[in-house]
Amino acid sequence: MLRRGHLAFRDVAIEFPQEEWKCLDPAQRTLYREVMVENYRNLVFLGICLPDLSVISMLEQRRDPRNLQSEVKIANNPGGRECIKGVNAESSSKLGSNAGNKSLKNQLGLTFQLHLSELQLFQAERNISGCKHVEKPINNSLVSPLQKIYSSVKSHILNKYRNDFDDSPFLPQEQKAQIREKPCECNEHGKAFRVSSRLANNQVIHTADNPYKCNECDKVFSNSSNLVQHQRIHTGEKPYKCHECGKLFNRISLLARHQRIHTGEKPYKCHECGKVFTQNSHLANHHRIHTGEKPYKCNECGKVFNRNAHLARHQKIHSGEKPYKCKECGKAFSGGSGLTAHLVIHTGEKLYKCNKCGKVFNRNAHLTRHQRIHTGEKPYECKECGKVFRHKFCLTNHHRMHTGEQPYKCNECGKAFRDCSGLTAHLLIHTGEKPYKCKECAKVFRHRLSLSNHQRFHTGEKPYRCDECGKDFTRNSNLANHHRIHTGEKPYKCSECHKVFSHNSHLARHRQIHTGEKSYKCNECGKVFSHKLYLKKHERIHTGEKPYRCHECGKDFTRNSNLANHHRIHTGEKPYR
């Protein structure tokens, strides 16, 4: 950080050794000139004067800019006018061999050494010809037009070194306030910029003067340096190389940002929580967490976001754009993260591993969601009833119970559902598809949960245990039904006779007594049944299926009750007295 004292121009200038300057191509020299021009513009309005025009004539002969230096002097007149004096050609030509380069200290306490390679451009802008002494009025009534044009540039210099100027005894208090509060502002629409060069580029947009045009795509730019950077997109040129890892970049600013990965430097600190960041843009995004600001609004639906990237991602929902395509199967995605996660399907790679149980996942979000099983964390709470959930989508689906919202509608029959999974499961009824197949017995199922429950018949797994009596169950729903035996709860009531039941299936079975309905028909013999369970048991007569096997002797049975009766032969149990 530069503090009060002398600031040499070399501290802000771009320096090239003699041999490197000769290696620069015309485009690179043009870029160098434009950067130096911007710096000179900033210095002029801090009180730095211009040299004699005879020195400029030397530049017209394309002399090496590295060998041209000049000393400029400033003098204040009592009448409130500032006289700018140049030096003659003879003294200027001798400066290249002088060892002592004198510097100028202006009223802000800064000293600068001028490089003259770009001063010809300044003279053209000021329309000065044939004079060695130019007077510039500094009183309010006689402000020069050039000073008006570049007032924003002066603000940039003051803003850039605000820490040096804030405590400077030479700077008026009102000017300090301007430094702190008013960055460069556009006179057309009032938009503010932190950097004067961006303001200048913005003003070129208003004048429709974009003189630099790309021959590849016809895009126009306000200055040649932007055009040079843009053309690297077409050429693929990446001239800036990281010496640590060899990675290449097309902009030096990107290289500087990348190098912080190796150095670990995080110069941007949040004053609210102390968190540090490698990029200023990351700090700005983070700061909105504290302020709650969401400046990016979707024009389609009005939804607001705290990051422009989030808005861009959201807008693809409306446009249907899916620019990220898998080269393996052709599937397209709206976001790069979606494609990255999808590619794992082809590679089989699972990068994220749970330290508790060793289970691996192909997405970090899935691992985070899984780890809540071990921690028991349920961070999402319903404001209506206080119920908590492990996942946000579960809370969203639950909340629709209170609102009655059913946004997912079947196009075949018009039935609506609270969540997408309910609609997806329902659609299989119309298609007849049963995509989930048991590897043990080849039985197929419409839902993955049904397959998981079925597979426990083969494994014997009963993960759900009753805390009251210790009985185990293969399904959580069976445990919930069983638990009502202990509580005596019977939440299902018949509207005809007001009889109550502990199970919804028992109520459905009971209702058929009133309706006389037998809606389940055997396709083999035409026999009808009032319950689906009865039909399934009956169908085993035709298929010969015996899914219940005794582990003691290997005998098979068509019904679970028959297996239970048989098992008593081995145990010797005689429950009926």
Curated annotation (Swiss-Prot):
Pfam families: KRAB, zf-C2H2. InterPro entries: KRAB, KRAB_dom_sf, Znf_C2H2_sf, Znf_C2H2_type. A zinc finger (C2H2-type) spans 184-206, 212-234, 240-262, 268-290, 296-318, 324-346, 352-374, 380-402, 408-430, 436-458, 464-486, 492-514, 520-542, 548-570. GO terms for molecular function: DNA-binding transcription factor activity, RNA polymerase II-specific; RNA polymerase II cis-regulatory region sequence-specific DNA binding; zinc ion binding. Keywords: Metal-binding, Repeat, Zinc, Zinc-finger. PANTHER family: C2H2-TYPE DOMAIN-CONTAINING PROTEIN-RELATED, KRUEPPEL-LIKE TRANSCRIPTION FACTOR. This is Zinc finger protein 880. It comes from Homo sapiens. The lineage of its organism: Eukaryota, Metazoa, Chordata, Craniata, Vertebrata. The gene is ZNF880.
